[in-house]
From Swiss-Prot:
Keywords: ATP-binding, Hydrolase, Magnesium, Metal-binding, Multifunctional enzyme, Nickel, Nucleotide-binding, Nucleotidyltransferase, RNA repair, RNA-binding, Transferase, tRNA processing. The keyword Glycoprotein does not apply. CDD domains: NT_ClassII-CCAase. Its EC number is 2.7.7.72, 3.1.3.-, 3.1.4.-. The gene is cca. GO terms for molecular function: ATP binding; CCA tRNA nucleotidyltransferase activity; cyclic-nucleotide phosphodiesterase activity; magnesium ion binding; phosphatase activity; tRNA binding. It comes from Burkholderia pseudomallei (strain K96243). Catalyzes the addition and repair of the essential 3'-terminal CCA sequence in tRNAs without using a nucleic acid template. Adds these three nucleotides in the order of C, C, and A to the tRNA nucleotide-73, using CTP and ATP as substrates and producing inorganic pyrophosphate. tRNA 3'-terminal CCA addition is required both for tRNA processing and repair. Also involved in tRNA surveillance by mediating tandem CCA addition to generate a CCACCA at the 3' terminus of unstable tRNAs. While stable tRNAs receive only 3'-terminal CCA, unstable tRNAs are marked with CCACCA and rapidly degraded. This is Multifunctional CCA protein. Its cofactor is Mg(2+); Ni(2+). Comprises two domains: an N-terminal domain containing the nucleotidyltransferase activity and a C-terminal HD domain associated with both phosphodiesterase and phosphatase activities. The lineage of its organism: Bacteria, Pseudomonadati, Pseudomonadota, Betaproteobacteria, Burkholderiales. Mg(2+) binds at D21, D23.
Length: 413
């Protein structure tokens, strides 16, 4: 029995990067032998075990064969006679199909096992598929795109790009389950350059199948005096990259991605203006979130940002009453942390424009000041003075907040 570290751990070590995850393959062993060494079985489709001390995952070497369309249609074979190279050949990219032996004390020993030229592709900064079996798993398209967001200087090898296009044309991505699509998109959004993920998906045609709402933004013009980059799709990519550069949360990055969906449906005769695109963005965003089963916290923030980002940009022109109405519509008084993230997404929107990446955004500070003042109003005390009159209580609290905001930010009621 031999144990090998495989995949990303070897790749990242060769690149001089911190190793995020460690995966192990066991060659020449049976499930019974693993159990005898106190490894705990956890795999459903094939034997995966947890180490008794470190709780890291160890998988028996296996081969796999495509039996049906989509992500789940595979038949696995595992036995002591499956070799390391047979296990590595089923992997997606050459840079992920390398291994090193692990000694009994856990140290990596011996040379890098690299049967498919992964080290050469690392040096050339190429994503290249291991073999023809790449086409059997449509998730690999999403994974290549996600890796592009992490390793932004890498390019997809031409033959790999051709295979990805063929998979899309064959309808393979249409069989992906929503949870897996969201998982890969979310992971890609959290990488350093998420725009690269969407570029790769767009180049192979997968973006139009997976996120047609985003694909439709490319080529839609905006006013050059507000958006020197002009193209709405380019703008959205700049916004998500700015959000990534600031280290914002997944919810903020998703809101940044989806805030302008409605611009794709602007009537051609009014372009490049986009009056009312905020409402159309909300109408497109709701079914998108339902289709991909987007988590509630991401969906809810994205809806606030899509609906209100135009108003957030205009707060320097607002009086206190309009500011309070905006805070109330955004539910900022009950959910100040979410509103803080809405301001981050709005600032990313303002700075995701060509030549305006460092432009000041005083709107955020004004809204923070307004929210502090509005939340300082003692609604309970006002309610006690007007017991039994709900309509009057609501109006009195609103007016008190308007007065507080007017005083705090120095604007008229």
């Amino acid at each position: 029995m031999k144990i090998y570290a495989v995949g990303g751990a070897i790749r990242d070590a060769l690149l001089g990067l911190p190793v995020r995850d460690r995966d192990y393959v066991v060659v020449g062993a049976t499930p019974e032998q693993m159990a005898a060494q106190r490894f705990r079985p956890v795999g459903k489709d094939f034997p995966v075990f947890l180490h008794p001390d470190t709780h890291e995952e160890y998988a028996l070497a296996r081969t796999e064969r495509k039996t049906a369309a989509g992500y789940h249609g595979f038949q696995f074979y595992y036995a002591p006679d499956v070799t390391l190279e047979q296990d590595l050949v089923r992997r997606d990219l050459t840079i992920n199909a390398m291994a090193r032996e692990v000694s009994p004390d856990g140290a990596l020993v011996g040379p890098v096992v690299d049967p498919f030229g992964g080290q050469a592709d690392l040096r050339a900064k190429l994503f290249r598929h291991v073999g023809d079996a790449f086409v059997e798993d449509p998730v690999r398209i999403l994974r290549v795109a996600r890796f592009a967001a992490r390793f932004a200087e890498f390019a997809v090898a031409p033959d790999t790009a051709a295979l990805m296009r063929a998979m899309v044309d064959a309808g393979e991505v249409d069989a992906l389950v929503p949870e897996r699509v969201w998982q890969e998109l979310a992971r890609g959004l959290m990488e350093a350059k998420p725009s690269r993920m969407f570029a790769v998906l767009r180049e192979c045609g997968a973006l139009a199948r997976i996120l047609p709402e985003i694909d439709a933004l490319f080529g839609v013009p905006q006013r050059a005096d507000y958006h020197p980059e002009v193209d709405t799709g380019v703008h959205v990519m700049m916004v998500i990259d700015h959000a990534a550069k600031q280290g914002y949360s997944l919810a903020v990055r998703f809101a940044a991605l989806t805030h302008d969906l409605g611009k794709a449906t602007t009537p051609a005769d009014v372009l490049p203006r986009h009056i009312g695109h905020e409402g159309r963005s909300v109408d497109l965003l709701k079914p998108l979130c339902e289709r991909l089963r987007v988590p509630n916290e991401c969906r809810d923030l994205a809806l606030v940002v899509a609906r209100e980002h135009g108003n957030l940009h205009r707060v320097m022109e607002m009086g206190a009453a309009a500011l309070v109405r905006l805070l109330e519509r955004a539910d900022a008084l009950r959910k100040p942390a979410r509103f803080a993230e809405a301001l981050q997404a709005s600032e990313a929107d303002a700075r995701g424009r060509l030549g305006l990446e460092t432009k000041p955004y005083p709107q955020a500070e004004r809204l923070r000041q307004a929210l502090v003042a509005a939340r300082a109003v003692d609604a309970g005390a006002i309610a006690q003075g007007l017991a039994g009159e709900p309509a009057k209580i609501k109006d009195a609290v609103h007016r008190a907040r308007v007065r507080a905001v007017a005083q705090a930010v120095g604007v008229a009621d």
